[in-house]
Amino acid sequence: METTTTLISTYADLLRISKVAALFVSKDKPHLSQASLAVVENNLTLSATDSYQAIIITTTIFADLSVTERVTTDVNGYDSHLVLSPKDMVLALSAHKGTAKGTNPELRVTIDDGKIWIASEAATNSLDYDYRDHVPNYTALLPKSDSVSEGNVGLNPALLGIAATACEVWRGKSDLPMILHHVAPGRPAHWSLTTDEGSLNGLLMPSRL
């Protein structure tokens, strides 16, 4: 079975990853230090490691990114079945983009009683969208840092996905020109999206590993 590397080079690539943005979750070990992406046949495989063991999350790449998808995850042997909509993650961007002076705060996501709550050091917001199915309680802590370099797949898919879904919801389209401004490794990378109605922008911090 051939494995090919997924290059994060277009807005479509970001949207493809966005549906698994909330899946970097571990019930017992929420902080994941590294992440990588690969495509095997029709499956997008995300591999994340912590200090104890490798965590493998696999989900299917769907052609229609505008519809709500059912995603099944198996994290540390813990199965969770979530019904995710782009609206469920849109407020995460507002919490993230409120960061001052180029810092990238921890972004905490809690799902409780069918609702998702998102908070960061910069802002605290809540999302009150109900899930169609029961959602088990857990808290996810997205990593603080991201690996940044030209064409590097080490970019944190969770934070990229949050930005992409937010932009998708904001305009209701998946073909808008999102620009990912690459810079030298070890330096922050900026992304931006501009339309007649305004602009969104964000910052991806380099890995400290």
Name what the model sees in each region.
Residues 1-209:
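DNA polymerase processivity clamps
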